[in-house]
């Protein structure tokens, strides 16, 4: 009888220990989940748009890099969102918005060897600069990076380029990002009227990220800022309900999406570590003016001027690969 009581007592103690351990583990998991949520919230707050009107995106470390063949097998928004797109929570993207096979069949190639310019580079946010930019030096801003891209296209590829250095986010001696797209549009339309041969529009920006994020890779031995292709979907996410924005009509939306996809996949095949996932937001930005319109983010505020300018070498190669007919 005593042995039975001892066994029951031991069993009871074991059960109690198991319960205590289970509760402790459960509390640990709850604390871990809470800390992770807080970290995400903290990072989101830290990632608030610094001095740029465009979004902040800290790249996730995906091991798998999408290429043309793997992209063709992606049919769901979940797959596309994992490997190709980063969809901002303010945007409502539908599976019908993206047809990979259709997009990859679009032919964007042009004869870029003509004497008349086919490419326009401009900067809706001309005042964006970098961590080591010298105050007052245009060469150290995104405009200087755009100038370097233009030089590469002209000197290395023989492609005529128009580089617009208009300051659409600088008014009355101050940086004013609000309304910069509305200021940019009539000025850029005048350039298109002056150069009707232009068919490719590149709105070049740099992103804004927390101070501990450095969007850099190495290409051919050079420290190189990562790039990100950017699309506006002209549809808001209204608490899970799609809200179209007819006042921001973009007749070239599918062309824009197809072009950024081709550029992104080409980048992955030529320079696997260069491109961040394509960012999707509402609105239309500067992408409604031409079918071959693109918005490209070059690095961020934590990159150096050298890193940003180094990114123009592979970017030019990617552009020519996708857009040049022969």
Residue ranges of model-derived segments:
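A short, glycine/acidic-enriched catalytic loop
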Residues: 210-248
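N-terminal Sec-pathway targeting helices
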Residues: 1-15
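Solvent-exposed loop/turn segments at secondary-structure junctions
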Residues: 126-129, 167-170, 206-211, 233-237, ...
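Catalytic-core regions of hydrolytic enzymes
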Residues: 134-217
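Short glycine-rich His-centered loop
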Residues: 117-137
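Active-site-adjacent mobile loop/cap segments within catalytic or ligand-binding domains
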Residues: 273-326
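Active-site-adjacent substrate-binding region
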Residues: 251-279
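N-terminal, intrinsically disordered, polar/charged segments of Gram-positive cell-envelope systems
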Residues: 24-112
């Amino acid at each position: 009888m005593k042995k039975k009581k001892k066994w029951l007592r031991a069993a009871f103690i074991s059960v109690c220990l198991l319960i205590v351990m289970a509760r402790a583990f459960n509390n640990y998991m709850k604390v871990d989940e809470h800390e992770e949520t807080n970290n995400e919230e903290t990072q989101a707050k830290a990632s608030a748009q610094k001095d740029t009107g465009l979004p902040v995106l800290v790249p996730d470390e995906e091991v798998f890099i999408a290429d043309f063949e793997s992209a063709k097998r992606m049919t769901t928004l979940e797959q596309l969102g994992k490997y190709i797109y980063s969809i901002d929570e303010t945007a409502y993207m539908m599976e019908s918005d993206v047809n990979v096979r259709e997009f990859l069949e679009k032919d964007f190639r042009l004869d870029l060897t003509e004497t008349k310019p086919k490419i326009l580079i401009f900067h809706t946010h001309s005042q964006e600069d970098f961590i080591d930019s010298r105050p007052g030096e245009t060469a150290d801003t995104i405009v200087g990076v755009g100038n370097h891209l233009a030089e590469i296209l002209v000197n290395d590829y023989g492609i005529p380029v128009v580089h617009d250095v208009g300051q659409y986010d600088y008014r009355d001696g101050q940086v004013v990002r609000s309304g910069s797209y509305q200021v940019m549009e009539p000025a850029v339309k005048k350039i298109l009227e002056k150069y009707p041969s232009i068919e490719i529009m590149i709105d070049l920006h740099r992103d804004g990220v927390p101070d501990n994020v450095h969007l850099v890779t190495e290409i051919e031995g050079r420290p190189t800022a990562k790039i990100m292709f950017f699309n506006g979907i002209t549809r808001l996410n209204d608490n899970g309900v799609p809200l179209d924005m007819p006042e921001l009509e973009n007749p070239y939306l599918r062309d824009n999406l197809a072009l950024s996809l081709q550029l992104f996949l080409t980048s992955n095949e030529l320079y696997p570590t260069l491109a961040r996932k394509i960012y999707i937001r509402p609105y239309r930005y500067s992408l409604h003016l031409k079918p071959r319109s693109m918005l490209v983010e070059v690095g961020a505020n934590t990159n150096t001027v050298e890193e940003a300018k180094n990114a123009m070498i592979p970017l030019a190669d990617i552009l020519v690969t996708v857009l040049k007919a022969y």
